[in-house]
């Protein structure tokens, strides 16, 4: 063999390694670029409401109509699977990496590099998806601004008028739904197509609410959701509207519509509450109408009770019929049973406290200054909504 032949042979052996290095470097570049784009989008989102409105109307629907359609085909919550993989898979992979680094002495650098790339892609995926499917949405114009609903301060008299209106409606609706031998609500409606139709029906009047809707998915490990005080959750990593199947069933239709509102870009909790109420209120299904009014009554009742005298509280509560009270108390009993549950994998009080702090922190980091208290702003939105319609 000649010297030239030997050199060519050596080069042919080295080329795959060089090629691999180039491949790895491109992965790093790709991740850095995606994270950089995410950072830029977040900066623009905080600075420009107009950009966020444009993004929500024209770009965000692309993810729903592609990725959302794909995950909707699955008969289970893909988001729940991703959480399971993250909770169990990542710690196990760290253990596997340490074992391989110890055992494969001659390939420690290569092993660390492979696992490093995997973790780098995971971080990139989280940052990018959270930005595209969640963070930007927090900085849009409000639902009221987008849809021409006036915003103004309201008197206690108007609040009490709204409360009385809700009581009148829900008392009548309570006679239209099925009940068991104990007088408690029995769900007869489906939790997917009816919810999608109810939400889609708002599309002709309100921006961004028409078109395709993802399929709502029940969470298998719903008790853990209950420990976190969650009735539903929009999961941006799977573009899914997930719900707690263990909770009291009268609350499910409204909860599902609430999560579907998030998949249309309305990420603020108070706005999703209002949208869910409107969808349920306009639904042809009695279960949905009842669920919407039950959720709304709870919010308005809490607002009235913030200032009302004992006599006024008694007067208001006495106007609510026995059937509605049966459902309100059954709902409270469920959440109380979760708090008092024994022999659970995780302590309910500890899980609830961690979840509450995490939610509060997340909301404030995304510009929601009053954190979880923002949920209660739904009452102000309802007052504006009904007043704009001339019904208050």
Q: Over which residues does each language-model region extend?
A:
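Transmembrane alpha-helices and immediately adjacent membrane-cytoplasm interface residues
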Residues: 90-95, 110-144
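Active-site recognition of the HExxH zinc-binding catalytic motif
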Residues: 75, 252-273, 277-278
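Auxiliary, metal-adjacent structural segments of Zn-dependent hydrolase domains
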Residues: 178-245, 249
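Post-HExxH zinc-binding segment in Zn-dependent metallohydrolases
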Residues: 166, 267-315
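Membrane-embedded alpha-helical segments of integral membrane proteins
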Residues: 37-100
